[in-house]
Swiss-Prot record:
One Gene Ontology term from the biological process aspect of the record: negative regulation of DNA-templated transcription
Skewed-composition ranges (Basic and acidic residues): 12-24, 156-172
Cited function: Negatively regulates transcription of bacterial ribonucleotide reductase nrd genes and operons by binding to NrdR-boxes.
Family under the similarity heading: Belongs to the NrdR family.
Organism: Xanthobacter autotrophicus (strain ATCC BAA-1158 / Py2)
Keywords: ATP-binding, DNA-binding, Metal-binding, Nucleotide-binding, Repressor, Transcription, Transcription regulation, Zinc, Zinc-finger
Start-end of unnamed zinc fingers: 3-34
Protein name: Transcriptional repressor NrdR
Top-level taxon: Bacteria
Co-factor requirement: Zn(2+)
KW 4Fe-4S (keyword) present: no
Leader peptide range in chain numbering: none
An annotated Gene Ontology molecular function: DNA binding
UniProt domain ATP-cone: residue ranges: 49-139
Length: 182
């Protein structure tokens, strides 16, 4: 594997172990040329997915782009990285098992929103504000109302699949208690 620091091609694996959820292999590598250390992940890819954008363009699915958009929504939020990784892996598994290699960006966005709703309310609203292109304060109010009434925002596809995390994490409460403004 090419070294991200110096471009050397002769990197060596120092440590290799499965991730906590056993969906990938984490490898620590070192470059003998520059001494740089970095981590790589090896994952199974069941099929080559293509994303159908709103503009009609088809682009290859990029898990890293999905992870970056989720990271932006979760920036400075107290959410464990392993939970985020489980959510992302669950979404990718769902996409790969849908049986179609062409997936709409809307389908991906709805799955991410459902996953974020279960991880962190603030991240959910942040992601929704970009994904749904909020223009005014009323849009935020509607998103907050969806959080207090979880059944309104779920798509039927995601509900049928058991949520973006495959239903493995905590069961969802019927409703969230109101928060005090402290």
């Amino acid at each position: 594997m090419r070294c991200p620091y110096c471009g050397g091609l002769d990197t060596q694996v120092r440590d290799s172990r499965p991730t906590e959820d056993n969906t990938a292999i984490r490898r620590r590598r070192i470059c003998p040329d520059c001494g740089g250390r970095f981590t790589t992940f090896e994952r199974v890819q069941l099929r080559e997915l293509m994303v159908l954008k709103r503009s009609g363009r088809r682009v290859p699915f990029d898990r890293d782009k999905l992870a970056r958009s989720v990271d932006v929504a979760l920036r400075k939020r107290p959410v464990d990285g392993e939970r985020v990784e489980r959510m992302l892996s669950g979404i990718v598994r769902q996409l790969e098992s849908m049986g179609d290699s062409d997936i709409t960006s809307q389908t991906i966005g709805e799955m991410v929103m459902e996953g974020l709703k279960q991880l962190d309310d603030v991240a959910y609203v942040r992601f929704a504000s970009v994904y749904r292109n909020f223009r005014e304060a009323k849009d935020f109010e509607n998103a907050l109302a969806e959080l207090s009434q979880p059944e309104l925002a779920q798509s039927d596809d995601v509900k049928a699949e058991g949520g973006a995390e495959g239903g493995r994490d905590k069961p969802k409460a019927a409703g969230k208690p109101p928060r005090s403004a402290e």
